[in-house]
């Protein structure tokens, strides 16, 4: 069963629409669905709401520590409520999936994602759930003929808003993720993965 859903992103209006904030977009939607208001909670270093989702009590969290210190926020809440790593779902932007793709998985490395890296370090575990929201990779913007030796600027890419056609398919992917959230929250993760990954994710 999932007791804590974390959306990753950077605080501040200048980052709201950027690719790196895709995790915030999902948690914002969940809060809206639950009629919950995310409020600044200093002891958890983030915006927090206790929500009633699909008949279960779920904690929603958007760390406000900047991405590379997200673990500080997650571990503060997890310790306070005695939530285990495998009861946590972290929604985050994923460079290795194209816009419009979304995948659910348990554990694994950080894939170069500084937010995941910090969460794993603070939890002393990689065994938490991840919802990987595809944003594409800047190398995909470079013509194949010019890719040899090119060094895509990943940092700049994730801190820019998606193009409109990308945003549309990312929004659709988030909607597909929301459709399987009842199963995820209730711990029916195999069913959720089958449904999510079958639906063109």
UniProtKB/Swiss-Prot annotation:
It is found in: Cytoplasm. GO terms for cellular component: cytoplasm. The record marks 93 as: Stabilizes the basic form of H active site to accept a proton. Its EC number is 3.1.1.29. One of its GO terms (molecular function) is tRNA binding. Belongs to the PTH family. PANTHER family: PEPTIDYL-TRNA HYDROLASE (PTHR17224:SF1). Monomer. HAMAP family: Pept_tRNA_hydro_bact. This is Peptidyl-tRNA hydrolase. It comes from Burkholderia thailandensis (strain ATCC 700388 / DSM 13276 / CCUG 48851 / CIP 106301 / E264). The gene is pth.
């Amino acid at each position: 069963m999932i007791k804590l859903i974390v959306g990753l992103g950077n605080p501040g209006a200048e980052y709201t629409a950027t690719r790196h904030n895709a995790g915030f977009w999902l948690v914002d939607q969940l809060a809206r669905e639950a009629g919950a208001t995310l409020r600044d909670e200093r002891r958890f270093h983030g915006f927090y709401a206790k929500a009633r989702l699909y008949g279960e009590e779920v904690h929603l969290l958007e760390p406000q520590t900047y991405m590379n210190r997200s673990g500080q926020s997650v571990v503060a809440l997890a310790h306070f409520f005695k939530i285990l790593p495998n009861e946590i779902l972290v929604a985050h932007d994923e460079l290795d999936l194209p816009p419009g793709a979304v995948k659910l998985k348990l554990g694994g490395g950080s894939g170069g994602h500084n937010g995941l890296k910090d969460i794993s370090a603070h939890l002393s575990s990689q065994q938490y759930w991840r919802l990987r929201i595809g944003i594409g990779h800047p190398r995909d913007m470079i013509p194949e003929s010019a890719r040899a030796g090119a060094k895509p600027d990943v940092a700049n890419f994730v801190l820019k808003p998606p193009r409109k056609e990308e945003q549309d398919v990312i929004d659709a992917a988030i909607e597909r993720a929301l459709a399987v959230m009842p199963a995820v929250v209730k711990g029916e993760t195999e069913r959720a993965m089958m449904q999510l990954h079958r639906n063109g994710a």
